[in-house]
């Protein structure tokens, strides 16, 4: 990782933003570029809901919300949800979708570091899913998420492990062979080993509670959670009590 860190207001890779801006209009197309996100969302939502003891009545922040797939589903569970993203077009899509579906979600265009400076310890649950591998300084994002959650609150991360298998599965397989996501979506150099993510967590008030893998079976075309964090994985952490 670069020793020279971007400022908190600019922990943004504009090339990454441009990728998602270009396809934002198709965010809610169940057969489009974001089909895998729609497919895994019930697993993500179930994991978050179960591990946090339910979302009803809780204040939730979704960091890197994109077009709002996870944010909207958490709002449907009865949470008061704020979605953060630096992409203008994805947020416009998310806002329009919320109006059409009658689901109330507040969408904000700012970095998580900027949000943490104004809203420290204000959320019961913070989610940061499939986002860390798209920013210049993921460690800074982890720290900001820790600042945003209330004492004894829950923070969830998901990302991709960095190894040969994840390159084969997430880049070669998903982008070039199965064409599940657009070519160039992922850069294996930006993938994050679980040990790296856990070391950043240990620098904060957060403590690891559970880690699980997210697995795809190309034969049955299904996803499931289970042991093994070689490729995609999700991490549940909890903030220390006050």
Swiss-Prot record:
This enzyme's EC code(s): 2.1.1.222, 2.1.1.64
Gene3D superfamilies from the UniProt entry: Vaccinia Virus protein VP39
InterPro entries: SAM-dependent_MTases_sf, UbiG_MeTrfase
Pfam assignment, any one: Methyltransf_23
Keywords: Methyltransferase, S-adenosyl-L-methionine, Transferase, Ubiquinone biosynthesis
Pathway: Cofactor biosynthesis; ubiquinone biosynthesis
Biological role stated in the UniProt entry: O-methyltransferase that catalyzes the 2 O-methylation steps in the ubiquinone biosynthetic pathway.
The family this protein is said to belong to: Belongs to the methyltransferase superfamily. UbiG/COQ3 family.
Protein name: Ubiquinone biosynthesis O-methyltransferase
Naturally occurring in which organism (per UniProt): Salmonella paratyphi A (strain AKU_12601)
């Amino acid at each position: 990782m670069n020793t020279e860190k971007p400022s908190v207001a600019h922990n943004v890779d504009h090339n990454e933003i441009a990728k998602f801006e270009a396809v934002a209009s198709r965010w809610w197309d169940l057969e489009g570029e974001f089909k895998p996100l729609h497919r895994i969302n019930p697993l993500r939502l179930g994991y978050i809901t179960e591990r946090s003891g339910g979302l009803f009545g809780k204040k939730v922040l979704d960091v890197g919300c994109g077009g709002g797939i996870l944010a909207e589903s958490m709002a449907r569970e009865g949470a008061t949800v704020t979605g953060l993203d630096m992409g203008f077009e994805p947020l416009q899509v998310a806002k329009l979708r919320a109006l059409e579906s009658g689901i109330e979600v507040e969408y904000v265009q700012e970095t998580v570091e900027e949000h943490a400076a104004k809203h420290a310890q204000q959320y019961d649950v913070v989610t940061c899913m499939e986002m860390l591998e798209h920013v210049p300084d993921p460690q800074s994002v982890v720290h900001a998420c820790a600042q945003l959650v209330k004492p004894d609150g829950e923070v969830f991360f998901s990302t991709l492990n960095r190894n040969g298998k994840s390159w084969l599965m997430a880049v070669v397989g998903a982008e070039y062979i199965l064409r599940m996501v657009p070519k160039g979506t992922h850069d294996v150099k930006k993938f994050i080993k679980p040990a790296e993510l856990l070391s950043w967590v240990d620098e904060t008030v957060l403590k690891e509670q559970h880690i699980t893998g997210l697995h795809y079976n190309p034969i049955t075309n299904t996803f499931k959670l289970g042991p093994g964090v070689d490729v995609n994985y999700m991490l549940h952490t909890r903030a220390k009590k006050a």
